[in-house]
Amino acid sequence: MASHPTLKTTFAARSEATTHPLTSYLLRLMDLKASNLCLSADVPTARELLYLADKIGPSIVVLKTHYDMVSGWDFHPDTGTGAKLASLARKHGFLIFEDRKFGDIGHTVELQYTSGSARIIDWAHIVNVNMVPGKASVASLAQGARRWLERYPCEVKTSVTVGTPTMDQFDDAEDAKDDEPATVNDNGSNMMEKPIYAGRNGDGRKGSIVSITTVTQQYESAASPRLGKTIAEGDESLFPGIEEAPLNRGLLILAQMSSEGNFMTGEYTQACVEAAREHKDFVMGFISQEALNTQADDDFIHMTPGCQLPPEDEDQQTNGKVGGDGQGQQYNTAHKIIGIAGSDIAIVGRGILKASDPVEEAERYRSAAWKAYTERLLR
């Protein structure tokens, strides 16, 4: 791991220097909550996922999901599982990271990200990419996020009124209809008046008027768009001390893995870093085993999986591995991941999920990861 100024800089200071809106928000959130913990919520049902997000949300800054392994996932855009997670994220102050590991040609990954039944981009603040197919996958995901964001420059509010006018009103409107342009109100809204009537009979008599429907559309600026959809009427809960997360989306590049025998070479990792530098408006950082910031203006964040703590009665400062799971995963302590390797966020799954008290264990991991960060600043 190369020495870099970000290793000795507080999250609060880094939040002011970074140019990515979502990275800045995440760093401020980490400082506010004194947490650099991500929960890998690999559970089989939507009910369990939402329960964990609600109970452990106060201890974490990122919730990592795998929507395609969750049975009972509700795809409704307003009231489904993704929308409920977004509501819990606002309530407890964390970001949602869908661990999709996109790994296909650019056109395909853009569609997987922005469309389909899940519409990941609508509810996940962060996604990641396996860059084996090449840099085009990063460029296409960035393009998809940019196009999606462009659809939110303003809010459209539509009102419809229906009424039955008097005959005198209709006479006035008919006399003027050939001379006046379409009605436009003061704020630029289009007002379309559509009379519904039987027309004139052959002898020139007017038919009866049924009604007039007025449709008004107002286009109001949304300079600071947010995920405004709520689960229930009046649900305005928001984590105190910080505004709602920006609508900007972010990408993590899978640069290194914690699994034994993986094929991510140094050459591949370097290509990931280069791609990140080319798309700094979208790429937040990396899934990696160490800090990859080397150039002076690199300000990427790093998230590292495979974090596990020894039992409470053992040394928490161990610098080595603490075993594996027998299926290739290799574990390291928070002290090793954050304090020595220079990562920013520790990703923890089974270490918390399999504990007798997951909420209490999440606090233990949060405390250990934060301590490793603060000690790194002083080193």
UniProtKB/Swiss-Prot annotation:
Ranges of compositional bias, category Acidic residues: 169-178
Stretch list, region Disordered: 165-198
Pfam family, any one: OMPdecase
EC number: 4.1.1.23
Entry-linked SUPFAM superfamilies: Ribulose-phoshate binding barrel (SSF51366)
Cited Gene3D superfamilies: Aldolase class I
Pathway named in the protein's UniProt entry: Pyrimidine metabolism; UMP biosynthesis via de novo pathway; UMP from orotate: step 2/2
Binding site for substrate: 42, 64-66, 99-108, 331, 350
Entry's Gene Ontology molecular function annotations: orotidine-5'-phosphate decarboxylase activity
Catalytic residues in the record: 101 (proton donor)
Keywords: Decarboxylase, Lyase, Pyrimidine biosynthesis
GO CC annotation, single: cytosol
Top-rank lineage group of the source organism: Eukaryota
GO biological process: 'de novo' pyrimidine nucleobase biosynthetic process; 'de novo' UMP biosynthetic process
Segments crossing the lipid bilayer: none
Reaction catalysed by this enzyme: orotidine 5'-phosphate + H(+) = UMP + CO2
Enzyme class: lyase
Disulfide cross-links: none
InterPro entries, per the entry: Aldolase_TIM (IPR013785), OMPdecase (IPR014732), OMPdecase_AS (IPR018089), OMPdeCOase_dom (IPR001754), RibuloseP-bd_barrel (IPR011060)
Entry's family note: Belongs to the OMP decarboxylase family.
PANTHER family on file: OROTIDINE 5'-PHOSPHATE DECARBOXYLASE
Protein name: Orotidine 5'-phosphate decarboxylase
Organism (species): Hypocrea atroviridis
